[in-house]
């Protein structure tokens, strides 16, 4: 309700009572209208004031309705939003974000919260990520002012170097998982709570079950035939005593995965890489036609890396280096920095068209540079920094009057495979620390291989390597050929943006395959309040997609 202001109503009443009657301002003509007696004037004045009170009451009522409607509209638009003054967890699984916040309430670090949240997302959005996949952390330590990257993406097994990959699913598509090693290294360096404690919420969730969410339900429907045809997948994702997939809000359980998580929680990461879980991984992947060995698991290491950092409009962007999508994201923002975009840049249809044309062209040129980027032979970012330094010269190549349908016009020399789905998580802790992490099993449900012993769904990351034989217009990128221990190129771009005082201004990333880079670029531009729409352009499809926000 809106409280009436007596003073305002009194003022309105006085103005009405002191006003001359309407007829007093018109010259009276006795032949037209006879003069009124004083009682009639009083009656007329009373009726006029009565009408004004009614009008005021109606206007106030309308104002109340409008206010209520506006408030309801605000809540409808942001029904899933949660606002926090000192800390926050943003994930694509609502119950998982709550787990992350609870971990921080228990005095857990931002990394503790990230690990606990990711374990949960591996259940809630089991089609996108899980312990059978890999990830990239970007971590900010506010006390030291340092940012680091932990790369635990999947690597090619030692027996895969001479194979030409022709499948995007099944055993041959499975790379060596790195998720758990990534958790372990991040926890070793930045954890505060006991390792075991981070697993408890997800173990409970896996055992007790939870309703199928919208994202998982859509993935199940989209892949209905493959799920229902697989005994191991149907064991979890189908209704009891039926081979029909679960629907949104149906209860889902992961009892075997709960046992696996308990073992990793109690024994540690070696249970996965050098223990009973590892034994089952090798056995099951082999039965599915894959090549992972015990030695592959034992030799796997997560890498601590130096991030790429670029300054854009006074902010510093930190992203992973190659072979992630970070260098392309940095290059895009440096190209666009020179245009000095502002709200004025999208104030009219004509200006908006020009602004988005420039953005799309920047996307194309930046993705072309990505295809020419060499595979890093060391953790030195020299080659990447050389690529980013081309921003000014690339901007000069962008024409405001035309585009080009010839892909060689943009300088692309080879094609990289399109990546599958992912899951992203952003965290800011009360102490100012931050985590941006993207995790994936690559395609939806990864390789479509699930162990009926451990409950692990395995990735299909081998599909992200370039094939030697390719029928595309351009040759495959040789720097992305499969080699033992190599990580494939990726669009994953978990980013952290700091201001000049080293305060976190944005923790950002995305899921959605190759659109990760362009979506993250536009969200980063939004930090500078430059645009209010998200625009995607996946070079080189030449079909931009626009989403208002």
Residue ranges: model-predicted function:
Residues 14-16, 20-102, 106-267, 272-324, ...:
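Noncatalytic scaffold domains of N-terminal-nucleophile
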Residues 111-118, 196-207, 275, 279-282, ...:
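Short, well-structured alpha-helical segments that form the helix of a local strand-helix-strand
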Residues 123-127, 136-140, 146-148, 292-293, ...:
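Active-site rim segments in enzyme catalytic domains, especially the processed small/beta chain
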Residues 129, 133-141, 423-427, 494-496, ...:
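Short beta-strand scaffold segments in enzyme catalytic cores
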Residues 304, 419-422, 444, 490-492:
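Short, small/polar residue-rich loop motifs at catalytic or cofactor-binding pockets
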Residues 326-342, 497-506, 512-535:
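M16/insulysin-pitrilysin zinc metalloprotease superfamily fold
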Residues 341-441, 450-454:
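Internal maturation/activation junctions in enzymes
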Residues 356, 367, 372, 431, ...:
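Extended C-terminal subregions enriched in glycine
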